[in-house]
Amino acid sequence: GWLLVEKLRDGHATSVGAASGVVAGLVAITPACGALNPLGSLILGIIAGGLCALAVGLKYRFRYDDSLDVVGVHLVAGVWGTVGAGLLSTTTGLFYGGGFRQTLLQIIIALVTIVFSGVITLVLGLILKATMGWRIDKDAETSGIDQEVHAESAYDLNASSGGRFGGAFADAG
């Protein structure tokens, strides 16, 4: 699903898109894994990939910070997997003759989960703001938070990149 959206939207599919699509499928199947057959699982995963690829693109339009695409992948795929279980369940799913009841229950539980998670996140965020603050000071941001807090950098930007296998292997001795 993700690769198809990339191909249609951008003219090419990417390896990052392939990996993100796999993650989206795994997230989506998690709430539905005990209720779907293999075909339903494939359908759920393919749709999850497409929905998440579209959702990740929205962060640029709405200008919100989601550097790891947590909202676009985990929230969207999780909600789709929860609702999709109500549609594709082999015992109670709408598409298997189970009626709309299970789908409605799945929608309700997805909404309850979103509200619960939002409230808990807000409370924890306010506690953090009151105790530590949400932002680091400008000097720490300029020098790098890894250096400021841990006295080290996550990346050795001065490493040699020579040698057959790059700097890390060349310097390893």
What are these regions (language model features)?
Residues 1-173:
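Glycine- and aromatic-enriched membrane alpha-helices
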